[in-house]
Structure formats: C-alpha cells, structure tokens
C-alpha cells in the first residue's frame, strides 16, 4: 500500500519531537500501522531558526494554509496551539476531507463540539490524545479500555507547572512567587503564567476528560476553576502536619443531581499514590463501577512524551482510514446520538470537607466565636491546630479541618468569620478529597 502523507503545522517543541519519533521509529510504526507514514510537508512561522529535528526532504512553508489545502496530504497534524487560527486551519483541513491529529486542548475544549460535528459530516477523524496529560494515554484508556464501565469519578494532576510549584514549596519551604519565577526561568511556565497557575489549562483538559467519561458535550464554560496563587508555605506545612498533601486537582464526579466539574487546590491523604506524584509529572485517577480506581502516571509535557501520543493517534488514523466511518471509535467515546444533556452542577452545590486557615487575635473567646459560626451553618470540626503566637505578636494562625458540608454553607460561614472584629484578613480555604 502507498504511504500515508502527513502535513505538520508547527515545528516547535512538540512538532520537532514528533518528526524525531516518526523518523527514529519509522520501521516499527509502519509495522503497527500497516502502512508507511511520511511527513511530506510542514509549516513554521520562522523557517530560518534552528530546530531539534531534521527537516531534510520535507517541503517547508510559512503559510499553514498551503498544507491544509494541499491535495496530496492525507493527514494534518496541528501543533501550533491557540484558538482562532488553529480552529480555522482544522476546519479547513476537515472541509478538504483530511483527517486531523491535534495536541491542542484549548481548541478541543472550546470548539470541539463544532469540530467533531464537521468531521462527522465529512467522514474524517479528529484525534487528540496529546491534548491531555502529554504522554499518558488517558483518553484511549477511558474511551476504549474502560468502555465496559460506568465512570463514577476522575481526579487528576493535569498541569505540570502547578505541580512543580507545590512540590518545591513543600520540599524546600519556598514561597509561591519564588518558585514561579524559577519555573519560568526553566521553561516550565510561560512568561504569562495565568493559564497554569489559575487552573485554566487544567480546566481545558478536565473538560475533555469529563466529556469522554460521561458522554456529555464539551462545556468548558461550566468548569469551576480556582488557582494556586493563594497557597502559602504555612498551608503546605500545616497540611503535612495533618497528614495531607496539597495538589492542584481537576475533579469530575457524576452524582444523582448532575456532574461536578472543578479545578482547585486540594488536600489529599499522604497515603494515596496520587498524593506522591511530584515535580512536573502528571497522574489521573479514574474510578469505574466495574474496575474500581485505576491510576495513570507519566510525563505530562515535553517534546517526545507528547510526540508519543501524537504518533499513536497517527497510527490509529492510518489503521482506520479504510474503515466505514460508522464503525470507527466515536470522537467523544459515545455515539453522537447518545451524547447526554446532564446538568453541570454549580460550585455552591459541591459537598466536601475543608481546610481553613485564619488569623485571629490571641485572646479568650475568639475560637469560641469561630466554632459558633461554623455550628450555626451545620459545619463540624474534624481537627484543629492553634499554636502560640511568635514573641511580640498579638495574632495567631488557627487551622481547622471540617467534616463534609455544602460549599454554599461554607461560603456563608467564611463571610461571617471574616466579619469578626477579632479576625484579620481573608480566611484561606482548601477543599479536601479522600479519593477512596
């Protein structure tokens, strides 16, 4: 059979890694796919810059539309990232009858419903394993490996930058701002780190995982996101003292009322495997009704880990190119006519336990006032730490773990506590999950 001709959009870190993997493992990949896969064309904004890959024999252009409109290209690999241009290129490729492989989580999370609808009309595939958790084949695991299960919940460390920052804060007692600056210097975080530290990047990925797990439309706008910027060294230290680790988790849970979709810092018991995933590594815990909890761990970013997922998608495309579109694995795991309209629950309906840290005057009656407010909202205390204030200080930090309560009750209780004259500043809140 004749080779499958591929056009790559973007020759940055992932694009270069993809070319290297395809070249180095060409024979093995062809044996798996049943046909040779050849990159014939590639686009890059700057054609003169040095690269991590060999582009000899590849037709290069600075105009990506030359590739998506080229009549001889069978598959387009989109690795430029971003929203508008990527969407335009992918939809053009689809309109021209080309299959698409992408690592673009923002594209899928925000525009995936439209992209998949157009792909179905044209009978082409759009695969996106590399969009979530880099080299971890988590999408294939949920979409195919766990197809016999009703997925009950999933929770994941799906942003390596945030995990690196929290790990450094814990292991070296460093402040958030200090570690963030280092992460930027090392290339783990962008110059504008908002997407990483405010939970937006993880929210994109959670949107995709939840859609595949529960058979719902992609709905990024309904994901609750809270970043790690307010986490302090004190929080990390007290969490450790209480037997927990702070991890920035993306959590999706199906309940009788609907589906929870949330990204936020979370206390996890130290004994959990996912609590011990450190540095820039990723991990996703998926619980199915038949299989129980399953954990997937690996590199969430990097040239070749992400390229591993891109190339795996290419192999899947080549294997299925000649099959009837009706017999292919659905884009979002469930058949298009079986996507369910299940409500996404508002954040204030979440029920969980909490870690609270507040600063109060060191005098009698203050703690009683705080516990009275919590009790008035039906909130019970599970554990409490109150240390002597430093010499010369009149305020003391109070740390509490609560039992499970509704988010809306906790919101009201925190507002009442912050209104006390004896309490200064904001009450720090971190949600707690046992993940059992």
Could you describe each region identified by the protein language model?
Residues 264-289, 303-304, 375-393:
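Low-complexity, glycine/alanine/valine/leucine- and proline-rich hydrophobic stretches
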Residues 99-101, 381:
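A short hydrophobic/small-residue beta-strand
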Residues 309, 314, 318-436:
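A conserved regulatory-domain signal marking ACT and ACT-like small-molecule sensing domains
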Residues 1-96:
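N-terminal glycine-/serine-/threonine-rich beta1-alpha1-beta2 phosphate-ribose binding loop
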Residues 85-96, 105-143:
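Rossmann-fold NAD(P)-binding glycine/threonine-rich loop
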Residues 45-47, 105-107, 113, 131-133, ...:
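Short, ordered loop/turn segments at secondary-structure junctions
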Residues 120-201, 208:
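Rossmann-like NAD(P)H-binding beta-loop-alpha module
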Residues 178-276, 281-283, 302:
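Substrate-binding/catalytic subdomain of NAD(P)-dependent oxidoreductase enzymes
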């Amino acid at each position: 059979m004749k080779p499958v001709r591929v056009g790559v959009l973007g020759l940055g870190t992932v694009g270069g890694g993809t070319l290297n993997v395809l070249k180095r493992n060409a024979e093995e990949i062809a044996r798996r796919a049943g046909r040779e896969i050849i990159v014939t064309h590639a686009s890059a904004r700057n054609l003169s810059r040095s690269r991590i890959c060999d582009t000899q024999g590849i037709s290069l252009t600075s105009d990506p539309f030359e590739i998506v409109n080229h009549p001889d290209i069978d598959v387009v690999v989109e690795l430029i990232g971003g929203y508008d241009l990527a969407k335009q290129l992918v939809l053009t490729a689809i309109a021209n009858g080309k299959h698409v492989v992408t690592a673009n989580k923002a594209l899928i999370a925000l525009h995936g419903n439209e992209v998949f609808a157009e792909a179905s009309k044209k009978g082409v595939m759009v695969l996106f394993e590399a969009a979530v958790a880099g080299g971890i084949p988590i999408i294939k695991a949920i979409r195919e490996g766990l197809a016999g299960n009703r997925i009950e919940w999933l929770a994941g460390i799906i942003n390596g930058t945030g995990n690196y920052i929290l790990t450094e804060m814990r292991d070296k007692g460093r402040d958030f701002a200090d570690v963030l600056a280092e992460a930027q210097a090392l290339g783990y975080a962008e110059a504008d780190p908002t997407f990483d530290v405010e939970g937006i990047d993880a929210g994109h990925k959670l949107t995709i995982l939840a859609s595949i797990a529960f058979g719902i439309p992609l709905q990024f706008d309904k994901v609750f996101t809270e970043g790690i910027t307010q986490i302090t060294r004190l929080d990390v230290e007290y969490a450790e003292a209480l037997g927990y680790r702070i991890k920035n988790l993306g959590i999706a849970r199906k309940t009788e009322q609907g589906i929870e979709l949330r990204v936020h810092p979370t206390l996890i018991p130290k004994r959990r495997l996912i609590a011990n995933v450190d540095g820039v590594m990723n991990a996703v815990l998926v619980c199915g009704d038949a299989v129980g909890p399953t954990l997937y761990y690996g590199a969430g970013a990097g040239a070749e880990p992400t390229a591993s997922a891109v190339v795996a998608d290419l192999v899947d495309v080549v294997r299925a190119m000649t099959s009837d579109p009706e017999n292919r694995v659905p884009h979002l795991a469930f058949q298009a006519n079986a996507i369910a309209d299940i409500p996404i629950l508002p954040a204030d309906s979440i029920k969980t336990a909490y870690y609270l840290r507040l600063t109060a005057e060191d005098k009698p009656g203050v703690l009683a006032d705080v516990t009275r407010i919590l009790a008035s909202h039906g909130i019970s205390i599970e554990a409490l730490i109150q240390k002597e204030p430093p010499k010369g200080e009149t305020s003391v930090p109070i740390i509490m773990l609560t039992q499970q309560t509704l988010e809306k009750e906790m919101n009201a209780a925190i507002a009442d506590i912050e209104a006390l004259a004896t309490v200064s500043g904001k009450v720090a809140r971190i949600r707690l999950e046992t993940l059992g």
